């Protein structure tokens, strides 16, 4: 049975990430930077984890904390720092996540565990998931949309792992149309 009970918000034609990457996918896209018009509707973006209450609901929805746990403004700020570090990894920026230390477990079931409890432990669990996904290669399929007016993080499910846009139907089409018009205009 799945531990995840939320709803994944995918772009049309977007591949579903592996289940263990879904919380990371949603964390990175909780900061929506889209600023284009699609079907007459302006995408305005926003931050869906801006308050302690929103963060508490999101973490509890992913079974990372108990629904009765206390979440503070500093927890929101720490979550934003983790999200920023993860999103910046797609632009070639390397960030050290010293704030979320992990413990290596060498036992019958080896793994990585957060060194803290509560919200910090939940964020450490997300950081550990990134480390494990890097080790198994699935993190390499997480990408940031190449469209400058989008920056949505997506899972590249293409056979050759060469996807550039979160959706070929929207962002890919817009980018290719712009390039065509630019070439036609410039001769």
What are these regions (language model features)?
Residues 142-147, 163, 168, 174:
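Residues immediately within or flanking Cys/His clusters that coordinate Zn2+
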Residues 156-163:
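Short linker/helix segments within small regulatory modules
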Residues 169-187:
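Basic DNA-binding region of bZIP-type proteins
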């Amino acid at each position: 049975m799945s531990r995840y009970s939320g709803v994944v918000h995918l772009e049309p034609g977007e591949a579903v990430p592996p289940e263990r990457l879904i919380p990371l996918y949603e964390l990175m896209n909780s900061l929506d930077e889209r600023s284009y018009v699609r079907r007459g509707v302006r995408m305005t973006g926003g931050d869906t984890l801006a308050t302690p209450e929103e963060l508490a609901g999101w973490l509890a929805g992913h079974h990372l904390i108990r629904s009765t746990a206390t979440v503070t403004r500093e927890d929101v700020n720490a979550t934003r720092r983790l999200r920023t570090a993860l999103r910046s990894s797609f632009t070639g920026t390397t960030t050290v996540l010293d704030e979320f230390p992990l413990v290596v477990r060498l036992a019958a079931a080896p793994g990585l565990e957060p060194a803290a409890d509560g919200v910090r432990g939940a964020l450490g669990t997300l950081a550990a998931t990134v480390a494990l996904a890097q080790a198994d290669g699935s993190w390499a399929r997480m990408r940031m949309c190449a469209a400058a007016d989008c920056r949505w993080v997506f899972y590249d499910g293409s056979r050759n792992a060469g996807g550039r846009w979160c959706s070929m139907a929207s962002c890919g089409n817009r980018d290719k149309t712009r390039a065509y018009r630019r070439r036609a205009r410039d001769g």
